[in-house]
């Protein structure tokens, strides 16, 4: 027989070159990770959250090492046993036996193969395992929920913290044992313990014992898996059922089947182990086949029979107990218990007089006419200032107190720097990263008014009224409102961070370099003085950042001095997710003025995906609406069955400081993470009153809850099973929308306290199941006293939903004719704003839709959308006009607009006198009257709850009459609270007399 060819020996030079090549490859693979690790070490330290970084690194490293060692050791042991117990003499099948050649090659590199393969397997397993560090930490630090599951009576902490870890361990034991089986099988085959030559082949005693032992251990692991499957039944979804969790078939067929299969698996494992002694391979083969057949017959066949024969004919009755479990668990898991949600019957179609509408001051004075999804171009046109400043396409809503102490909602935005808008030499490295470093200003517009009436030739009407807190031309901070601000410079924000290689080099290094503001004669620069930023004054950090950003200017530019710092990772949500990696953040991040500083407020959620009997849903699907689709701003596609808005986070817009506050201190998941990362989350008591005033009920949580309330408002399990009383989230009726209607932040009368005080709330209408009639109206309070309370107004009958209301408004003869004239020959692009649904009067609903037009003239200012009309609908009646006042008067009659907010004063063109404000101003393009409607008489000026921004001079008599109107309104509200109908009627008459007196007074 010809001897097998030997592997050629490598020369010393070849070995050195191979070693160098391997070192270069390792450096290329690990170098960027080492650089990123060091940069993150610096970044977390600068933020004060280095313990978060080190805890992650240590946990990942220990998990990697533990799993790598276990997998490597198991595979090594399997290979070593196969090698150590190999036959002394191994016959070959001839000179061309391929196994002999492989055997020779392996023997020539035995140490490399014997160590390299286990090391490679261990490294791969460790790399995968370290991604599950959160599951391990929750297992180590998780506590109890104080609530037990309805089937086994086990605390829910077992399902949240323990069961996922046990399943993870079982999965890795399966994988390790299976890999050991494969390694041992190949080893015995390679070294002759298993031979396939001849009719029956041969199997050595050592190979039989080792392989059978591994198969038996796999069966024992399968028995453990059947045991754990019992608990996972409580959070799985069976196809065709309208609820999550174990149903009748699962409890009465699948659950016993799991126990039976577990016993069969143990018996089969014992049978397999017996083959070690009995030396009969038919026994383990029979055991494996028996387990497979049992899983098909007992595990799948029997439940199918029970489902088809017993459950299907009487599904509603059979499943009612388990539906009740699902209703209770879902309400608990998503914060929809009776303590959090109040249901009230609400007519939805009650009639309302002009006096009743005027008496609803909290709502009528705050009717929102600015759509934050439309007015961003107007912000850009009038408040951009420089080409490199920018506002996001979708602005935000927040509330502030006006000068009279009244709660008002505002469209707010931070004027950020957008590096993508730099041009020409502004884009070079020095300008991009050390000159244009920050934004400037907080812009707010009252959402219930605009500057003047659109189409008035003497005024630039229809645009937002801007309150800009900025660095002024003299370097002083100009802060007219809505709250005092000391530092308007913005170094951190979502716009500035939405650029690749986003970083700014700041700090004292010679003369001030950062662009700040301009005077009439010069440009003024600024030097950053905040605490944020990683120092890069030494050569080590400069070299590290040069490697990170592949930018040699870090090494050679004189812009960087010993006091220089680098600002990076400037997106507020990303910063929060970095220091709290266990949080899922809301897609909406909004700016607010808190304690005279601009901060970004970020809502953080803790979630679970295995809460027993709770509805399992896609977070991405549940939070999708027309706004998110338009911006392509969607939540990750993760499954959740439990969610809490457990953390409120703030990010300082100037220095980037991240502060985490515990919003839901009773959340067991939050409590577990606070044990993992102690001292990183501040208690709820540390939330200042100023910050509390600007915390909003988060949009994504609200959208998840409204989707669940569509089903889980039903108490009766039989009705739930039939789905006959379900609701639907309405589609956005706007012609340009393509998804569900988003919820809207508004200031209106307080539904949580059920009084006429003003409240900032997040609201949504709900339709009947697969119909366009209203079923409910949901309001979530953001007020500090009632924060998080959900009020659900259930509406009987056939009250028009958003789609029907919008169709009625847009097809109304007067509306369509007027807008047809305005948009004739494409002179103007008509855009409908958000359709608001507002509870009004003593049981009615008012729909309000602002209408915008973007003229096509060459004038740059006129190419931006301005408010031209306000359309309303109440009980199938349409109101329409240039202002809220006009629309209310058109809809309810004279006096309905007594407490509505009118347009603010505007600056007249040069050389012209100011025009009077109010309804006595001649409308340049008043909407036509409806067919059969008498011409509307010109109404005199009427009282308003909040004076317009421009100066208004009233006569002594008129001022006294206005005081009488306000006194009558106060008396009417007192009568409403007292519930005395006689007193209420007298108060209404008093208000009517006061309004008539005001209108008659000159």
UniProtKB/Swiss-Prot annotation:
Cellular component terms (Gene Ontology): extracellular region; plasma membrane
Residue span of region Disordered: 891-958
Pfam families in alphabetical order: UPF0182
Location in or out of the cell: Cell membrane
Membrane topology value: Multi-pass membrane protein
Keywords in alphabetical order: Cell membrane, Membrane, Transmembrane, Transmembrane helix
Compositionally biased region (Pro residues): 937-950
TM region positions: 16-36, 61-81, 112-132, 174-194, 209-229, 258-278, 286-306
Record keyword Transmembrane helix present: yes
Compositionally biased intervals (Low complexity): 893-923
Similarity-based family: Belongs to the UPF0182 family.
HAMAP family, sorted: UPF0182
Protein's recorded name: UPF0182 protein Mvan_1814
Organism of provenance: Mycolicibacterium vanbaalenii (strain DSM 7251 / JCM 13017 / BCRC 16820 / KCTC 9966 / NRRL B-24157 / PYR-1) (Mycobacterium vanbaalenii)
């Amino acid at each position: 027989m010809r001897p097998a060819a030997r592997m050629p020996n490598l020369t010393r030079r070849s070995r050195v070159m191979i070693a160098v090549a391997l070192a270069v490859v390792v450096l290329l693979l690990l170098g960027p990770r080492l650089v990123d690790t060091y940069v993150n070490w610096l970044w977390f330290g600068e933020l004060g959250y280095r313990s978060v970084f080190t805890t992650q690194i240590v946990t990942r490293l220990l998990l990697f090492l533990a799993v790598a060692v276990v997998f490597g050791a198991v595979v090594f042991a399997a290979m070593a046993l196969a090698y150590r117990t190999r036959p002394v003499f191994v016959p070959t099948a001839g000179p061309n036996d391929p196994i002999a050649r492989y055997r020779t090659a392996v023997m020539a590199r035995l140490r490399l193969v014997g160590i390299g393969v286990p090391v490679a397997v261990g490294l791969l397993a460790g790399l995968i395992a370290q991604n599950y560090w959160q599951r391990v930490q929750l297992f180590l630090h998780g506590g109890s929920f104080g609530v037990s599951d309805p089937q086994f009576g086990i605390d829910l902490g077992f399902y949240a913290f323990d069961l996922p870890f046990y399943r993870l361990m079982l999965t890795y034991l399966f994988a390790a044992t299976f890999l050991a089986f494969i390694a041992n099988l190949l080893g015995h085959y390679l070294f002759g313990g298993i031979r396939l030559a001849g009719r029956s082949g041969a199997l050595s005693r050592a190979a039989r014992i080792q392989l059978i032992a591994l198969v038996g251990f796999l069966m024992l692991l399968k028995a453990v898996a059947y045991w754990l499957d019992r608990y996972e039944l409580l959070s799985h979804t069976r196809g065709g059922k309208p609820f999550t969790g174990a149903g009748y078939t699962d409890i009465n067929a699948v659950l016993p089947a799991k126990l039976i299969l577990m016993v069969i698996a143990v018996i089969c494992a014992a049978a397999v182990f017996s083959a070690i002694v009995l030396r009969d391979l038919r026994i383990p083969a029979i055991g494996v086949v028996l387990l497979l057949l049992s899983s098909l017959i007992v595990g799948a066949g029997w439940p199918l029979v029970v489902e088809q024969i017993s459950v299907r004919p009487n599904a509603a009755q059979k499943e009612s107990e388990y539906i009740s479990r699902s209703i209770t668990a879902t309400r608990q898991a998503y914060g929809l218990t009776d303590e959090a949600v109040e249901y009230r019957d609400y007519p939805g179609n009650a009639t309302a007089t002009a006096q009743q509408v005027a008496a609803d001051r909290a709502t009528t004075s705050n009717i929102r006419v600015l759509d934050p999804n439309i007015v961003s171009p107007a912000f850009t046109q009038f408040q951009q200032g420089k080409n490199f400043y920018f506002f996001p396409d979708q602005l935000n809503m927040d509330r502030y107190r006006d000068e009279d102490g009244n709660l008002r909602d505002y469209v707010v935005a931070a004027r950020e720097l957008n590096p993508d808008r730099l041009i020409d030499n502004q884009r070079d490295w020095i300008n991009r990263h050390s000159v244009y470093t920050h934004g400037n200003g907080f812009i707010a517009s009252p959402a219930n008014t605009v500057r003047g009436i659109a189409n008035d030739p003497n005024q630039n009407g229809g645009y937002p009224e801007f309150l800009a807190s900025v660095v002024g031309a003299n370097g002083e901070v100009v802060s007219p409102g809505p709250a005092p601000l000391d530092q308007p410079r913005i170094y951190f924000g979502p716009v500035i961070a939405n650029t690749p290689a986003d970083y700014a080099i700041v700090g004292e290094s010679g003369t001030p370099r950062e662009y700040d503001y301009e005077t009439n004669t010069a440009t003024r620069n600024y030097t950053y003085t905040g605490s944020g930023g990683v120092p890069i004054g030494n050569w080590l950090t400069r070299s590290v950042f040069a490697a990170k950003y592949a930018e040699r200017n870090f090494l050679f530019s004189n812009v960087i001095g010993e006091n220089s710092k680098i600002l990076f990772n400037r997106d507020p949500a990303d910063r929060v997710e970095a220091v709290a990696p266990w949080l899922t953040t809301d897609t909406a991040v909004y700016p607010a003025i808190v304690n005279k500083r601009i901060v970004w407020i970020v809502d953080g959620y803790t979630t679970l995906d295995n809460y027993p009997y709770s509805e399992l849903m896609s977070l991405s699907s549940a939070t999708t609406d027309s706004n998110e689709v338009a911006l392509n701003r969607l939540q990750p596609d993760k499954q959740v069955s439990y969610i809490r808005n457990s953390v409120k986070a703030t990010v300082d817009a100037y220095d980037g400081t991240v502060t985490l506050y515990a919003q839901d201190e009773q959340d067991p998941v939050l409590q577990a993470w606070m044990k993992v990362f102690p001292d990183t989350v501040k208690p709820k008591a540390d939330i200042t009153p100023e910050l509390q005033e600007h915390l909003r009920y988060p949009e994504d949580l609200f959208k998840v809850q409204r989707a669940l309330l569509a089903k889980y408002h039903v108490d009766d399990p039989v009705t739930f099973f039939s789905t006959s009383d379900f609701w639907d989230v309405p589609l956005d009726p706007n012609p340009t929308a393509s998804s569900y209607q988003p919820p809207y932040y508004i200031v209106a009368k307080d539904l949580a306290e059920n009084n006429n005080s003003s409240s900032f709330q997040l609201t949504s209408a709900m339709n009947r199941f697969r119909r366009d009639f209203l079923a409910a109206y949901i309001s979530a309070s953001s007020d500090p006293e009632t924060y998080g309370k959900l009020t659900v107004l259930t509406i009987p009958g056939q009250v028009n939903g958003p789609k029907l209301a919008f169709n009625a408004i847009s097809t109304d003869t007067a509306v369509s004719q007027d807008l047809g004239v305005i948009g004739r020959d494409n002179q103007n692009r008509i855009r409908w704003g958000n359709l608001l649904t507002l509870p009004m009067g003593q049981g009615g609903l008012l729909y309000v839709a602002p209408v915008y037009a973007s003229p096509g003239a060459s004038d740059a200012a006129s190419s931006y959308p301005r408010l031209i009309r306000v359309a309303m609908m109440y009980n199938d009646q349409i109101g329409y006009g240039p202002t809220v006042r006009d629309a209310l008067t058109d809809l309810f009659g004279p006096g309905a607009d007594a407490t509505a907010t009118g347009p603010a004063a505007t600056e007249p063109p040069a050389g012209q006198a100011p025009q009077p404000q109010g309804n006595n101003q001649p409308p340049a393009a008043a909407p036509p009257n409806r067919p059969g409607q008498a011409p509307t008489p010109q109404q005199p000026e009427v009282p308003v709850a909040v004076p317009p921004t421009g100066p208004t001079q009233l006569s002594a008599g008129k001022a006294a009459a206005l005081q009488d109107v306000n006194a009558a309104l106060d008396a009417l509200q007192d009568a409403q609270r007292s519930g005395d109908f006689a007193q209420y009627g007298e108060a209404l008459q008093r208000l009517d007399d006061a309004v008539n007196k005001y209108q008659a007074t000159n």
